[in-house]
A protein has these predicted regions:
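Extracellular glycoside hydrolase catalytic/binding regions
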Residues: 14, 21-27, 34, 38-168
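Non-catalytic C-terminal accessory domains or segments of carbohydrate-active enzymes
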Residues: 225-242
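Substrate-binding cleft of extracellular glycoside hydrolase catalytic domains
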Residues: 1-18
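Substrate-binding cleft of secreted/luminal carbohydrate-active enzymes
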Residues: 131-223, 227-230
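Alpha-helix initiation/capping motif
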Residues: 5, 115-116, 148, 222, ...
């Protein structure tokens, strides 16, 4: 879909406006933490024309969020070095109303995909540090256990490290709840990869894929994530009085 055309920009604005109107009237309005106005816009690796259009759309999105008193969630658009690229724009925004969205795959979609655990963990730590230092909260809006090693012990460490580190800023959302195995993988990944996207398959104790960390509510979330052998360090402390 040519999202960057004027016609589709206008259609998107109509859809987003209607979404805000609907959300503000919804009975569960109070639990909404943020609104994504466009998911994973493809800027063609930072094409200047596309990024300019995207920035304008994000400025408009922020105005709508302010109007309806709902924070907006803005994806980086796959530009090179996204945290550096968007730092100036995000520095101008209200961090209580704008959330930066990243969909990290520190052991997948790389060239080449890393197979050394030290490299994989360091990739996660780098993401955590960038999120901690960013001018607005960063949500890891899509992540998974997918990796190129496919060993349960490494996958468990990989999951634990991501859960603990991605909470340093705006939190995270795992992708996704369940992936069904297909006998005809035309578009989807092979079974040994697809299962690492599947939370349901990684929750059972002793499963062969990797153990997803289970929070039982007996401690604070911070204490829980700090208990997961956090290879990147413990969650930072913030002074909320300033």
């Amino acid at each position: 879909v040519p999202w960057f055309t004027p016609q589709n920009q206008n259609l998107s604005k109509v859809a987003v406006t209607n979404m805000f109107e609907w959300l503000t009237k919804h009975p569960a309005h109070s639990v909404i933490s943020g609104v994504t106005t466009v998911n994973e816009p493809q800027t063609d690796n930072g094409n200047t024309t596309r990024v300019s259009i995207l920035r304008d759309f994000y400025r408009w999105s922020i105005q709508q969020g302010d109007k309806y008193n709902l924070p907006v969630i803005l994806h980086h658009g796959f530009v090179p070095e996204p945290y550096r690229y968007w730092d100036d724009f995000m520095s101008e925004q209200d961090p209580s109303m704008v959330i930066f969205d990243d969909h990290p795959y520190p052991a997948w979609y790389q060239n080449p995909n890393p197979t050394n655990e030290t490299v994989i963990i360091q990739n996660i730590c780098d993401l955590g540090q960038q999120g901690e230092d960013f001018p607005v909260p960063v949500v890891m809006g899509e992540w998974s256990g997918v990796n190129n090693v496919n060993q349960s012990e490494l996958t468990t460490d990989y999951l634990n490290t991501q859960v603990s580190t991605y909470g340093w800023s705006g939190g995270s959302m795992f992708f996704n709840y369940r992936v069904n195995t297909t006998q005809n993988p035309v578009v989807g990944p092979p079974a040994n990869i697809g299962v690492e996207y599947s939370l349901l398959d990684m929750l059972p104790q002793g499963n062969a894929v990797g153990q997803f960390p289970i929070y039982n509510g007996s401690t604070s979330v911070r204490a829980f994530t700090n208990s997961l052998r956090p290879s990147c360090g413990r969650a930072p402390s913030y002074d909320l009085t300033t």
